[in-house]
């Protein structure tokens, strides 16, 4: 990452069994041939492919803050995550939408920045309609700063 540019890596999902093995062994190696992987192509690590496929994007598709990097000043510029989000869903996309709305550039790091996501039960998605509406509003109105964000916590520390 650099100021004015956030980077997005790829994510490989581990099955419950692969996660249990990884946690039990502690010293293990994962790659495209490992058992129990979803999104297997994301496990490919290649300098050549990285050079060919890493590119700038203005899309929200595939935004996952589990493997995401940016500068603190860029976070503060948009007031961080919107604390009004409840439950699972869309907070990552809404955060990235405000970054893009503010002129911060996205760069996808294909085949180089790989995160292995441990299995866990899925969270309740009952708040998804409200979260979808909040994301749609941010996109439609080109919102840059959320009202209830990180500023609230920074003020409390003073």
Residue ranges: model-predicted function:
Residues 43-44, 48, 140-158:
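Intrinsic low-complexity, glycine/proline- and repeat-rich
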Residues 2-36:
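Conserved donor NDP-sugar-binding/catalytic core segment of glycosyltransferases
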Residues 18-23, 121, 127-130:
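Short aromatic-enriched loop/helix-cap "lid" or pocket-rim segments at secondary-structure transitions
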Residues 112-113, 126-150:
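Catalytic core of nucleotide-sugar-dependent glycosyltransferases
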Residues 6, 67-69, 115:
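Conserved hydrophobic/aromatic beta-strand scaffold that supports enzyme active sites
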Residues 14, 109-126:
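Active-site donor/metal-binding and catalytic loop motifs
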Residues 35-70:
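A recurrent flexible, glycine/aromatic-enriched loop bordering the glycosyltransferase active site
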Residues 62-63, 67-79, 86-105, 110:
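A short, conserved alpha-helix in the catalytic core of glycosyltransferases
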């Amino acid at each position: 990452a650099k100021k004015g540019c956030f980077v997005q890596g790829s994510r490989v999902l581990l099955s419950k069994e692969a996660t249990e093995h990884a946690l039990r062994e502690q010293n293990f190696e994962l790659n495209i041939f490992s058992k129990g992987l979803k999104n297997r192509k994301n496990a490919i690590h290649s300098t050549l492919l990285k050079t060919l496929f890493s590119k700038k994007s203005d899309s929200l598709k595939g935004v996952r803050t589990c493997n995401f990097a940016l500068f603190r000043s860029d976070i503060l510029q948009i007031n961080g995550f919107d604390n009004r989000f409840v439950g699972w869903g869309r907070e990552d996309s809404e955060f990235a939408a405000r970054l893009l709305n503010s002129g911060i550039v996205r760069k996808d790091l294909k085949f180089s920045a790989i995160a292995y996501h441990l299995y866990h039960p899925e969270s309740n998605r009952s708040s998804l309609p409200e979260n979808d509406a909040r994301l749609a509003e941010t996109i439609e109105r080109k919102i840059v700063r959320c009202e209830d964000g990180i500023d609230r916590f920074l003020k409390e520390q003073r």
